[in-house]
């Protein structure tokens, strides 16, 4: 999959990332390099290799699940830029 400046522009717009026009082509080249690397990884034979979730074999301490009444919605949303009725209000990002 080749990534061009138009694709970078579209992805940047969807991600709400301001990207100057003079950076689109270098970013496209960089993303194409990343995609090439991913394609190389996809060609690696991993048959018989056990999947890992971590390279460190250490367990996490478990705690008892306890039902609580939850937090105070006003306290939780106090630092939010915008909230309504105890819910966070965020801008629509999917078109």
UniProtKB/Swiss-Prot annotation:
Family classification: Belongs to the GatC family.
Catalytic class of the enzyme: ligase
Encoding gene, per UniProt annotation: gatC
Coiled coil spans: none
Alphabetical UniProt keywords: ATP-binding, Ligase, Nucleotide-binding, Protein biosynthesis
An annotated GO BP: regulation of translational fidelity
Organism: Caulobacter sp. (strain K31)
Protein role: Allows the formation of correctly charged Asn-tRNA(Asn) or Gln-tRNA(Gln) through the transamidation of misacylated Asp-tRNA(Asn) or Glu-tRNA(Gln) in organisms which lack either or both of asparaginyl-tRNA or glutaminyl-tRNA synthetases. The reaction takes place in the presence of glutamine and ATP through an activated phospho-Asp-tRNA(Asn) or phospho-Glu-tRNA(Gln).
Summary of subunit composition and partner proteins: Heterotrimer of A, B and C subunits.
Enzyme Commission code(s) on record: 6.3.5.-
Domain of life: Bacteria
Sample GO molecular function, one term: glutaminyl-tRNA synthase (glutamine-hydrolyzing) activity
Gene3D superfamilies given in the database record: Glu-tRNAGln amidotransferase C subunit, N-terminal domain
Catalytic reactions of this protein: L-glutamyl-tRNA(Gln) + L-glutamine + ATP + H2O = L-glutaminyl-tRNA(Gln) + L-glutamate + ADP + phosphate + H(+); L-aspartyl-tRNA(Asn) + L-glutamine + ATP + H2O = L-asparaginyl-tRNA(Asn) + L-glutamate + ADP + phosphate + 2 H(+)
InterPro entries assigned to the protein according to its UniProt record, in alphabetical order: Asp/Glu-ADT_sf_sub_c (IPR036113), GatC (IPR003837)
Name listed for the protein in its UniProt record: Aspartyl/glutamyl-tRNA(Asn/Gln) amidotransferase subunit C
